[in-house]
Structure formats: structure tokens, C-alpha cells
């Protein structure tokens, strides 16, 4: 899967699952603020990404995933 295709799929999935406008999910936007995530919702997001893309996001890596660009790069390099 090409990176742009992966990003489009991820944006669509996250927007639908967390009821956020796709336009709000910009590469440099803060994930927690944009999606209004608390710690439980963050766990849900990680599980969803793991399931949809077959990439395990490791707990120690979570603090480094601040923006959607960080998340895209993390997932794409591990696919």
C-alpha cells in the first residue's frame, strides 16, 4: 500500500470511528486535541490502527506520536 493510500484510509477510519471531520485530521494537528482523546479513547485508537493496518503500536512509543504525521510515519514504516 502506498503511503498516500494508507493516509486516506486512516483518516477515513479515524474520522468515522471518533466522529471527527476528516478536514480536521491534518498532518501537523495534535492527535489528542483534534480527536478529543482521553487515555481510554487513545487505547481504542491504538487497537483500531493495529487491527486495520496490522501494525502494533508499542506503549513506550505512544508519547512520540503527537501529530497525525507522526502516526502516519510510524505506521507506514512498520507495514
Where are these regions (language model features)?
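Phosphopantetheine-dependent thiolation modules in NRPS/PKS and related acyl-activating systems
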Residues: 2-35, 45-46, 51-79
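Conserved ATP-binding motifs of the histidine kinase catalytic
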Residues: 38
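Two-component histidine kinase catalytic core, primarily the HATPase_c
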Residues: 41
Amino acid at each position: 500500500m502506498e503511503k498516500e493510500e494508507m493516509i486516506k484510509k486512516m483518516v477515513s477510519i479515524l474520522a468515522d470511528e471518533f466522529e471527527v471531520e476528516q478536514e480536521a485530521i491534518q498532518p501537523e494537528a495534535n492527535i489528542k486535541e483534534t480527536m478529543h482523546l482521553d487515555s481510554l479513547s487513545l487505547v481504542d485508537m491504538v487497537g483500531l490502527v493495529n487491527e486495520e493496518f496490522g501494525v502494533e503500536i508499542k506503549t513506550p512509543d505512544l508519547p512520540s506520536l503527537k501529530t497525525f504525521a507522526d502516526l502516519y510515519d510510524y505506521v507506514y514504516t512498520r507495514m
